[in-house]
């Protein structure tokens, strides 16, 4: 049996999912948290049972070693030879990587060079890649980029109206993120609609603590709300989304903060947390709003308002929409936010059933049968997309 492992390495964490391929059956999944701290947490699910241990895991290499040992100890695999492919999520591929790629030394160098575009994520992704290569050097490794799917955007979508030399010299442009998720739900939507993705106009709403909207026409990303970084676009859990750029020097002058500190505020203290003053967690805000907290209600309204702006502009951009898709933590689970987003879209031909909307995390249509525009909840599955790309590249390598 051939097995592929999908890896998402963060600065202090390592998420994994092991697949039997090509059947795409999930064998096990888990996460190593608090890597580098004394009380690291190792969690793995075996035969439906979640096993949690608190152990000292000083670095990613030890985390990988431990993960592989646990797979043997729990009899998930008989030997390391059963793992025939490793897929790594990499946040930023820039223009260099328009698609997933076989990892060699040059690819690692290129990903490291792109770290200035994603300083929080790419270095951690590379650490994960190197740790696996050291322990399983002969297994096919593949990098799957969050930005790759959006590389089909036309220049009018990705260029900022800045001096063109900034794009040529520094790579300043819109890149977009959550690409693996947008790609998965768009392909799955086509399956559910029974139509080729090539003839569909889709609006995909990846709404989680980080959130982005994408306009997908003919299976290709035409535009997306995140920009040069994942800070742009709609209001999010702790991120501001789009603001007037002149606010940055203004805030610096008023508060005495450095540019770096203001950026920190925009990334970590803004969005729903900033407006509400309570929490970045949507569930807390829904509870508070229900109790009559005006600021919690306002934070939710701002979130929905920004989503509406993208839905309207992207519908115009594609000259219509065939389906709106909700995915990720909020999109899949919050009937409240879906209702607020869908209300007022009747002019576009969106007719949805409030009774169908009362679900959490399951794949289903929310529209009435006669609705010209379909509305679908599709739980995202980035790990499966990673495993599929590994399979494709492994078979062609």
Curated annotation (Swiss-Prot):
Pathway terms, separated by semicolons: Metabolic intermediate biosynthesis; acetyl-CoA biosynthesis; acetyl-CoA from acetate: step 1/2
Cofactor note: Mg(2+). Can also accept Mn(2+).
Family affiliation: Belongs to the acetokinase family.
Biological processes annotated in GO: acetate metabolic process; acetyl-CoA biosynthetic process
Binding site for ATP: 15, 206-210, 281-283, 329-333
GO terms assigned for molecular function: acetate kinase activity; ATP binding; magnesium ion binding
Main location: cytoplasm
Cofactor(s) recorded in Swiss-Prot or TrEMBL: Mg(2+); Mn(2+)
Subunit-level organization: Homodimer.
InterPro entries: Ac/propionate_kinase, Aliphatic_acid_kin_short-chain, Aliphatic_acid_kinase_CS, ATPase_NBD
Sequence positions that bind Mg(2+): 8, 382
Name the UniProt record assigns to this protein: Acetate kinase 2
Catalytic activity: acetate + ATP = acetyl phosphate + ADP
Residue numbers annotated as active site: 146 (proton donor/acceptor)
ATP-binding found in the keyword field: yes
GO annotation, cellular component aspect: cytoplasm
């Amino acid at each position: 049996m051939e097995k592929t492992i999908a890896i998402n390495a963060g600065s202090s964490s390592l998420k994994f999912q092991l697949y039997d391929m090509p059947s795409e059956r999930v064998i096990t999944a888990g996460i190593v948290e608090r890597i580098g701290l004394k009380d690291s947490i190792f969690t793995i699910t075996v035969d439906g049972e979640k096993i949690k241990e608190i152990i000292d895991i000083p670095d990613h290499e030890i985390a990988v070693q431990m993960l592989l040992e646990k797979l043997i100890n729990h009899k998930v695999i008989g030997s390391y030879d059963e793992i025939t492919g490793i897929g790594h999520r990499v946040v930023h591929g820039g223009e260099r990587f328009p698609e997933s790629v076989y990892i060699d030394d040059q690819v690692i160098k290129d990903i490291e060079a792109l770290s200035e575009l994603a300083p929080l994520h790419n270095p951690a992704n590379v650490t994960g890649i190197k740790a696996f290569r050291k322990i399983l050097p002969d297994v096919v490794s593949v990098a799957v980029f969050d930005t790759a799917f959006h590389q089909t955007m036309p220049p009018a979508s990705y260029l900022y109206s800045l001096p063109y030399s900034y794009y040529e010299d520094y790579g300043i442009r819109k890149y977009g993120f959550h690409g693996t998720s947008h790609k998965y739900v768009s392909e799955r939507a086509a399956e559910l609609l029974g139509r080729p993705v090539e003839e569909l106009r889709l609006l995909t709403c990846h709404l989680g603590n980080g959130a982005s909207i994408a306009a997908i026409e003919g299976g290709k990303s035409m535009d997306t709300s995140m920009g040069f970084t994942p800070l742009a676009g709609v209001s999010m859990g702790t991120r501001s989304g789009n603001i007037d750029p002149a606010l940055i020097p203004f805030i610096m002058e008023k508060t005495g903060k450095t540019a770096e500190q203001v950026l920190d505020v925009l990334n970590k203290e803004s969005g729903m947390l900033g407006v509400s003053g309570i929490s970045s967690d949507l569930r807390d805000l829904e509870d508070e709003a229900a109790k009559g907290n005006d600021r919690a209600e306002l934070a939710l309204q701002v979130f929905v308002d920004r989503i509406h702006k993208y839905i309207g502009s992207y519908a115009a951009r594609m000259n219509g929409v065939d389906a709106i898709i909700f995915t990720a933590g909020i999109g899949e689970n919050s009937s409240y936010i879906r209702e607020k987003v869908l209300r007022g879209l009747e002019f576009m031909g969106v007719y949805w059933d409030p009774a169908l909307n009362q679900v959490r995390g399951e794949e289903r249509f929310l529209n009435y049968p006669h609705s010209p525009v379909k509305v679908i909840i599709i739980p995202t599955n980035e790990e499966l997309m990673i495993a599929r790309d590994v399979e494709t590249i492994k078979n062609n390598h």
